[in-house]
Amino acid sequence: MRRTVTAALAALVALAVITPAAAVDYYSGPLIDAHGHLPNATAIDTYVAAMRRHNIRKVMLLGVGPVQPQEAEWIDAALKKYPDLVAAGVRVPDPTNMAAAGQLDVELARTKARVMGEVHIRQTGSKIERDPSGPAFMRILELSAQRGVPVVIHDELTPAAAASLEAALAAYRQATIVLAHAGESTPATLERLLARNANLMIDLSGMHFQRKPSLAKEKGPLDRGWKALITKMPDRFMVGLDLWVARLFEPAMLDRLMTWTRRVLGELPPDVAEQIAWKNAATLYHLD
């Protein structure tokens, strides 16, 4: 009996050695990076080269506000140099200023941009704490509703922050808010918000293996909770890399991040992956 068991175990070990690991199905279709930034004037060249290597059709460049006074020039130059690959949002002035909406209206008329942002509502690292249901931001949402132009916000959700966000969403149902980085929240919290607010979209930007919380480690599987929610509500999510610091624009790192993105998308049902990868962004931002 012992000899039989030993032989069986040896056979299993041999089979494990010669049987290849299950192949990972990478998503191979088009991609739109729905949330990008520039750290300097030249990073766009490295990024576009990586886009071409990885079949990324478009990147939506967003502003980060007063911390980069020159970014408007960098973004304008990128648009002119790569008009087929780069789209851009309108930078939002101080969202607590009652004049901000009027300034945005002028810029939207001038640029024909299809998104406003990124607006920092709650960012603990920079000690930013703003109320999205406050009067100045309400004017911005009114403009969003009138022009049909979504606004991207950075809002690190707590129960109180989520309540304020929901009040803003309820005030202008025709305005679309895109919650960047999934609000650094949980699938359970977002599922409730999404179910109650049809005018809320989620971009999954910056949730790669270089940051926390991440959708997946560099070689690990897609988190089960995120996979379940994305599959359940595939029309509410978009991918984005949210690259900003210069070290992330190094070619080798870009290759790793873009490969990771395709691997994670490959874990979703093909029709869901296609929506998250590019269809939702193309529809929301009117991208070709």
Regions found by a protein language model. Name each.
Residues 2, 22-30, 35, 45-49, ...:
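Mid-to-C-terminal alpha-helical segments outside catalytic/metal-binding sites
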Residues 83-86, 90, 130-239:
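Catalytic pocket-lining loop regions of alpha/beta-barrel enzymes
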Residues 36-44, 63-71, 93-100, 124-131, ...:
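Acidic-and-aromatic substrate-binding clefts and catalytic sites of carbohydrate-active enzymes
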Residues 35, 51, 59, 88, ...:
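Divalent metal-coordination and catalytic microenvironments
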Residues 7-17:
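Bacterial N-terminal signal peptides
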